[in-house]
């Protein structure tokens, strides 16, 4: 739903250590045969491809809050900067999720709402091999070939950027 511009927030169990804003790539894990029609490139295969990118300009922490003495189960709330909590209804609506769907995904734990801005869907979806992963070593970050999508998220760079840096050395 991100690629269709309907989803304004992505709910995740984790968040990167990066500060906002940062670029996030959209990997389509859809079933075989997913396609999109681009005015420039025509019909393109989407599944198992990076189909676009967005800027994450804000991350909200989702946490469970219940009323003292209530028998009602705690509900998802957004933790505010002054450590207050407000209901997560608007965030869940922007994420195209019901509270039950969010709870099922988060398995009763806390999570994060990644806010989506500057959405860019590629005319031609890109293969993972066009990106380079970054692995943390004792000498700093080191490029590594990406052969499969990360299970949640990973730090990547576009292969073209890495090649340009290497040529400039």
Predicted regions and their residues:
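Structured alpha/beta reader/binder surfaces that contact nucleic acids or chromatin modification marks
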Residues: 1-169
């Amino acid at each position: 739903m991100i690629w269709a511009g309907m989803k304004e927030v992505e709910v995740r169990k984790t968040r990167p250590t990066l500060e906002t804003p940062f670029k996030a790539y959209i990997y389509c894990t859809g079933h075989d045969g997913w396609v999109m029609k681009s005015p420039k490139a025509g019909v393109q295969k989407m599944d198992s491809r990076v189909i676009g990118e967005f800027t994450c300009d804000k991350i909200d922490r989702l946490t469970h809050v219940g009323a003292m003495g209530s028998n009602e189960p705690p509900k998802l709330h957004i933790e505010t900067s002054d450590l207050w909590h407000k209901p997560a209804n608007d965030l869940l609506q922007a994420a195209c999720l019901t509270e039950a769907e969010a709870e099922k995904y988060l398995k009763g734990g806390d999570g994060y709402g990644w806010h989506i801005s500057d959405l860019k869907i590629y005319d031609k979806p890109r293969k993972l091999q066009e990106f380079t992963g970054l692995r943390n070593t004792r000498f700093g970050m080191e490029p590594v070939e990406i052969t499969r999508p990360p299970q949640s998220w990973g730090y990547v760079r576009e292969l073209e950027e890495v090649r340009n840096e290497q040529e400039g050395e």
